[in-house]
Amino acid sequence: MSVAILVNLKARHGSAQVGEHIRRILPDARVAVTSSLDEARAWVKDELVPHRPSLLLSGGGDGTAVALLNELRDQGMPLPTFGLLGLGTGNGWARATGDVGKRAVLRGLERLSNAGQDLPVRTFDLVETEGRVTPFAGTGWDAQILADYKDTVTKTPRALDRLGGSTGGYLRSLFTKTIPRQLFGERPRVRVVNLGEDALTVDASGKAVPLPGGERGRVLYEGPLSVGGAASTEELGLGFRAFRFAHLVPGRMAVRVYAASTAGATLRMPLLWRGVHPLADDHHFFVTKCRFEFDRAVPFEIGGDLVGERREVELSRHPVPISLVDFRRVH
């Protein structure tokens, strides 16, 4: 098995030391320790395209994995079996296939080194938007919390950060920055239009059912927006199950609009975090393609990275699913 591994030095748990640990565990692997997107692009072009690996592992956060996937697409390289090494901050996607953090990643690679050729995998759909593929994309609190949390991390001394932990830092930024800002601002409004096959929704018991009036061209939702987006994985990171129904309907992406007021959402935060269903003002759809139309420019994030403000975005299910190594079943 030919293995290639990218380690992002800018990821929360990425370092040259981690790269050396990986080389000792997998001495035959091609390991690149990079500090910029340009370095990663050069590695893909010079190393991976001429000599395609059978297994490619992304060491970083969700943004690292998404950037690597899209660079492979841009270079016209067929995607090998992919794996996520959760060395980032939230690690929403990586948590679907294994434990995260430096120690957990190294333990997973130790098991991988003894696993042989036939690795267990999980198949995931991908969301496509603005020419990029991603496990999730959206706006509202998810994008704003992300920006606030990253700002908090950069300004928090490492000793305090270790005491607070990732979840503690996330909640600290949520309650000291994002929520106060939202309490005193008017929420945007959004119209969600179905552009694909007839939409499905979910009933109170969690079962997927046809949505009356959900045909192509129909408005699925119109009203206030606190959080909205599409995903093919359950978590946005740190255990936040923002899309608990992401795998409910194969061949569809899960679209969610949470419309509760800031005060109401704050009171329900533990329920939101765990993905409890049903909740008031919560709207779930399963579609192949849709458009979000906003009444103002809003922050938009793709796979954990903010990409700017948008008045309108289209999201669709990418036609080719991806196979991810399931580290929980690697023995």
Labelled PLM ranges:
Residues S58, V66, G86, G228, ...:
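Aspartyl protease active-site motif detector
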Residues I5, V202-G206, E215-E222, T233, ...:
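ATP/nucleoside-binding phosphotransfer catalytic cores, i.e., glycine-rich phosphate-binding loops
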Residues Q17, G63, G140, L248-P250:
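Conserved active-site and cofactor/substrate-binding residues in soluble primary-metabolism enzymes
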